[in-house]
Amino acid sequence: MSAGKRGALIIFEGCDRSGKTTQSRLLVELLKSKGIPTLPMNFPERSSSIGQVINSYLTNSKDLPDEVIHLMFSANRWEHINQVKEKLLEGTTLVVDRYSFSGVAYSAAKGLDFDWCYAPERGLIKPDAVFYLRAPPNDLTHRGQYGKERYEKVEFQGRVAEVFNRICSKEGSYFHQFDARQSVEDLHAQIASITEELLPKVATRPLDTLS
């Protein structure tokens, strides 16, 4: 497995508590163990001034109109675009827990227009692969700390899953769907296999943008 001339942008997406954080951590550990320069990231990135407002919203200590928080989530990704581009071109693979697709899915699930939600994401760097972990929201409620944050409600997560399905159809071949109910080990093995094939393919491929 080799990172080649540039790194890959790999995204983990899915409903809350679907296993994204665990699987992204395992993939980072695997790639690093093979000597591949790899950096974990997650969105929202809560340490910036924008990220701190988002964190206050998610932890229910601040209320904002749906349109405003959607644009803040997008701005949080935009404020890191130069870092993302720089790392990829250096040859570092980025493994990212949530990206633009979560922003669209969660806001559209609240009733905002799908195309309006997508608009501010256009121009961000297009992922080389998205690993979408699917599971019925009812099957995720037993997982640790479910319900602690604003969006962790089964009915709402069901609507989020419906929008994710629409996004998968729209974005096509670089979306890889997995049953999140399988064992951590089996899921990791499948993701590792796809990643092993992916890295040399994208090494000389120019960066693309979401459109």
UniProtKB/Swiss-Prot annotation:
It holds the Pfam family Thymidylate_kin. Keywords: ATP-binding, Kinase, Nucleotide biosynthesis, Nucleotide-binding, Transferase. Signal peptide: none annotated. It catalyses: dTMP + ATP = dTDP + ADP; dUMP + ATP = dUDP + ADP. Pathway: Pyrimidine metabolism; dTTP biosynthesis. SUPFAM superfamilies: P-loop containing nucleoside triphosphate hydrolases. Belongs to the thymidylate kinase family. Catalyzes the phosphorylation of thymidine monophosphate (dTMP) to thymidine diphosphate (dTDP), the immediate precursor for the DNA building block dTTP. Also able to phosphorylate deoxyuridine monophosphate (dUMP) with lower catalytic efficiency. dGMP and dIMP are also phosphorylated but at much lower level; other nucleoside monophosphates do not show any detectable activity. This is Thymidylate kinase. It comes from Drosophila melanogaster.
